[in-house]
Amino acid sequence: MVFRIASSPYTHNQRQTSRIMLLVLLAAVPGIAAQLWFFGWGTLVQILLASVSALLAEALVLKLRKQSVAATLKDNSALLTGLLLAVSIPPLAPWWMVVLGTVFAAIIAKQLYGGLGQNPFNPAMIGYVVLLISFPVQMTSWLPPHEIAVNIPGFIDAIQVIFSGHTASGGDMNTLRLGIDGISQATPLDTFKTSVRAGHSVEQIMQYPIYSGILAGAGWQWVNLAWLAGGLWLLWQKAIRWHIPLSFLVTLALCATLGWLFSPETLAAPQIHLLSGATMLGAFFILTDPVTASTTNRGRLIFGALAGLLVWLIRSFGGYPDGVAFAVLLANITVPLIDYYTRPRVYGHRKG
């Protein structure tokens, strides 16, 4: 008789894990749809590239480790890693970037530690940060939302730009990034940070086309609301708990409000922080990763609050416009310490 030796954790429930990952993938549909609507078909192409890359990379490592490829890939975690990375990068980023980031996330940030359940850092955010540090220009080249864009690439144009850098008519990223004011557009957070450093007043900045939205940046507010809708559905399905999203958003809103009240000429208003960038994606889909987040209820509140504080600090005073990825990874580092001091007292034992 042959016995198969499996690595810990031995209580791992494959069916339950697969179901939760599938629920998260389904909950991402509103956010993906919003990004497709406002930023074009490039998002879908990036998702397909990332998904295939994640599956192939994990299959290769599992084969080398002589583990069951089919059984492991059925947990859907590889697909989720690819999806989270794909929706975090600009929709028309070169194809090799999403492949590189996804392969790094799947192999180095996940399988190198032993696979799902043993990685200390969120794999998708590791891949994102590697790309952001290595290729900052490409990683910050977001298209303007279609409502303020001059050139809206179709499906074929998106594929051509991703794989060749040019559309069929010879257009490139510089022409595609032009807004209705004839100026290359950036995200609301990037525009605010750059303009403040250039000495522009907040009143002037709020007149830019990118801030033509009702609540925050054009397009971005609806993208964030779509991710919020998906996150609320996850809460309703009990696929995630409320502690991390709530503490993250409350802390971010509180810090942003206090900062804005004390320095309204240099710091962004709270609605811009809450409805721009990757705020809602981070709150409900990234920080709630059960493997890399805190495991106690008090710990989850602390973990979410820490991430919210870090996001505000990085956005307001750091060198990057959106600090969600860095905040997630920095918060991941503190998880063992948080869990140690927030673990429930064993019955019959004194505190201390």
Swiss-Prot record:
Modified residues (FMN phosphoryl threonine): T187
Record-level GO BP terms: electron transport chain; transmembrane transport
Main location, first listed in the record: membrane
Enzyme Commission (EC) number: 7.-.-.-
Transmembrane portions of the chain: 20-40, 42-62, 89-109, 123-143, 214-234, 242-262, 267-287, 301-321, 322-342
Membrane topology field: Multi-pass membrane protein
Protein's name in the database: Ion-translocating oxidoreductase complex subunit D
Natural source organism: Escherichia coli (strain ATCC 8739 / DSM 1576 / NBRC 3972 / NCIMB 8545 / WDCM 00012 / Crooks)
Gene designation: rsxD
